[in-house]
């Protein structure tokens, strides 16, 4: 009987093919398939995220920052777009990252950036800050006091500035920037003075550099804006004590000077979360009332050795964030190049689609946002 059924089925299929000869068969539209057959599936990434619980001590004062310094260049010159986890373009990327737990947008600003550094312009920063503020986000401006990005071993003065007048020029420049931001309706929530300073702010001696930072901090605070400093990570975490002491002495020199945040730039291949915990503990002990944050960090989701993944990126961010937070320190971090489409350590792939690691900022606050993606069963 089974053989008879197979024979009948074969004859029917052959007859159907014969009847359809000469007939053009139009393929189903991909969009039609997506609309009628696409199913929502819970991704492995979502399962991975559920193990991350709310961090004790996290709150409104915790800095959950994303650097968007490249945003204007990507949007206007490179015509990049940003998409959600389902690959659908979002109408407002600032509102979108806010929905994923980000509460602060940060931009870097150079004095006279040119060519490849043009993305660091004050004009770009104004536009990004205004968009971020409109989306209900806090904002941070990192003033580089250089014409390009600065690092621990490279604090190059802007063109036309001399070392002997650098402190005066820097304070004057700061006032000008704050005035321009105010006129543009882009006054930030906080200003970070310098980036990855390593005892060499404005190429001055250690003490003179700290004094210059303190004087600038007074200018910022006089404008009603919170201040932060960004330092290169010392070889030993406990060495942050020396920086704290020098800042304290320098701030005493200028009545009204002070700071709200002390930030350290972290590199995952060098600094562990245990290192960050020691930084936090030292700041708590030696600078009570000051908030220790990671002023810049980025973790790879892809590397040449094939060891990095979205899962490892997610874990690194959570561990670093947790290391900065306890009941005494609201902590937080600013994720560098967060907006960069296609970078191996950003939150958006080459197509602009968000990766689930972005959602760790929400999960760290106890909010389990939906990171499920659509899978087309025809593909």
Spans of features found by a protein language model:
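Sec-dependent signal peptide cleavage junction
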Residues: 21-40
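Aromatic-rich peripheral "rim/lid" segments of glycoside hydrolase catalytic domains that contact
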Residues: 50, 54, 254, 286, ...
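Structural preference for beta-strand elements that scaffold enzyme active sites
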Residues: 61-65, 103-106, 138-140, 187-192, ...
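Active-site cleft segment of glycoside hydrolase catalytic domains centered on the general acid/base Glu
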Residues: 121-124, 150-259, 268-288, 303-319, ...
């Amino acid at each position: 009987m089974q053989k008879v059924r197979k024979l009948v089925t074969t004859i029917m299929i052959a007859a159907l093919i014969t009847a359809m000869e000469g007939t053009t068969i139009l393929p189903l539209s991909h969009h039609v398939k997506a609309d009628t057959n696409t199913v929502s599936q819970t991704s492995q990434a979502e399962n991975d995220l559920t193990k991350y619980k709310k961090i004790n001590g996290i709150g409104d004062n915790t800095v959950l920052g994303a650097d968007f310094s490249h945003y204007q260049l990507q949007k206007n010159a490179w015509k990049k777009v940003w998409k959600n986890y389902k690959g659908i373009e979002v109408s407002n990327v600032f509102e979108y990252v806010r929905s994923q737990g980000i509460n602060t947008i940060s931009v870097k600003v150079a004095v006279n950036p040119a060519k490849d550094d043009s993305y660091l312009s004050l004009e770009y920063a104004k536009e990004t800050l205004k968009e971020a503020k409109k989306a209900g986000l806090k904002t941070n401006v990192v003033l580089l006091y250089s014409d390009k990005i600065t690092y621990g071993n490279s604090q190059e003065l802007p063109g036309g500035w001399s070392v002997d007048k650098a402190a005066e020029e820097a304070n004057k420049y700061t006032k000008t920037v704050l005035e321009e931001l105010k006129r543009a309706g882009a006054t930030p929530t906080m200003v970070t003075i310098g980036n990855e300073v390593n005892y060499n702010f404005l190429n001055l001696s250690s003490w003179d550099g700290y004094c210059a930072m303190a004087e600038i901090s007074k200018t910022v605070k006089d404008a009603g804006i919170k201040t932060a400093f960004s330092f290169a990570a010392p070889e030993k975490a406990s060495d942050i004590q020396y920086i704290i002491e020098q800042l304290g002495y320098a701030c005493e020199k200028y009545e009204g000077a002070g700071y709200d945040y002390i930030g350290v730039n972290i590199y995952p291949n060098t600094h562990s979360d245990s290192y960050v915990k020691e930084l936090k503990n030292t700041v708590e002990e030696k600078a009570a009332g000051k908030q220790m944050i990671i002023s810049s960090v980025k973790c790879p989701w892809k590397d040449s050795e094939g060891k990095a993944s979205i899962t490892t990126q997610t874990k690194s961010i959570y561990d670093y964030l947790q290391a900065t937070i306890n009941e005494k320190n609201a902590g937080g971090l600013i994720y560098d190049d967060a907006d960069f489409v296609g970078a191996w350590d950003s939150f958006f792939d080459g197509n602009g689609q968000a990766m689930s690691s972005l959602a760790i900022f929400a999960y760290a606050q106890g909010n389990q946002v939906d990171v499920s993606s659509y899978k087309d069963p025809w593909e």
